[in-house]
Amino acid sequence: MSSPHVLVVDDTHVDRHVISMALMRHNVRVTAVESVMQALVFLDSEHDVNMIVSDYCMPEMTGYDLLMEVKKSPRLVHLPVIIASSDNIPERIRKCFDGGAKDYILKPVKIADVPRILNYI
């Protein structure tokens, strides 16, 4: 079996790097982009993504917006979406779960978080 492929979406370079490195230490193939629009373009052309890990707070479109786009697409609806945020806001967390997110993890993402989120693949 080939390594799982995770799309990481975060507007902050450092956070993209931290999440990507944590995933790669678990033999995960990572594609990292800095915006929801870049993620949507990538998802439109790439068919072997197994999961999305997205920041919540980003300019223009949020991680929740990405979640909604994924869940309304017949081709993508099956993809597990994990929301990562430095904000521990119960209403936001509930909204993401209600929208179909598989998990909501607090940043910074730690190596110990990775096995849990990989279980969603």
From Swiss-Prot:
Disruption phenotype: Dwarf, narrow leaf and low tillering phenotypes. The keyword Transcription regulation applies. The keyword Transferase does not apply. One of its GO terms (biological process) is phosphorelay signal transduction system. It comes from the Eukaryota. SUPFAM superfamilies: CheY-like. The modification 4-aspartylphosphate is found at residue 55. Keywords: Cytokinin signaling pathway, Phosphoprotein, Transcription, Transcription regulation, Two-component regulatory system. Residues 5-121 form the Response regulatory domain. InterPro entries: ARR-like (IPR045279), CheY-like_superfamily (IPR011006), Sig_transdc_resp-reg_receiver (IPR001789). Two-component system major event consists of a His-to-Asp phosphorelay between a sensor histidine kinase (HK) and a response regulator (RR). In plants, the His-to-Asp phosphorelay involves an additional intermediate named Histidine-containing phosphotransfer protein (HPt). This multistep phosphorelay consists of a His-Asp-His-Asp sequential transfer of a phosphate group between first a His and an Asp of the HK protein, followed by the transfer to a conserved His of the HPt protein and finally the transfer to an Asp in the receiver domain of the RR protein. SMART domains: REC. Expressed in flowers and panicles. Functions as a response regulator involved in His-to-Asp phosphorelay signal transduction system. Phosphorylation of the Asp residue in the receiver domain activates the ability of the protein to promote the transcription of target genes. Type-A response regulators seem to act as negative regulators of the cytokinin signaling. Belongs to the ARR family. Type-A subfamily. PANTHER family: TWO-COMPONENT RESPONSE REGULATOR, TWO-COMPONENT RESPONSE REGULATOR ORR8. This is Two-component response regulator ORR13. It comes from Oryza sativa subsp. japonica (Rice). The gene is RR13.
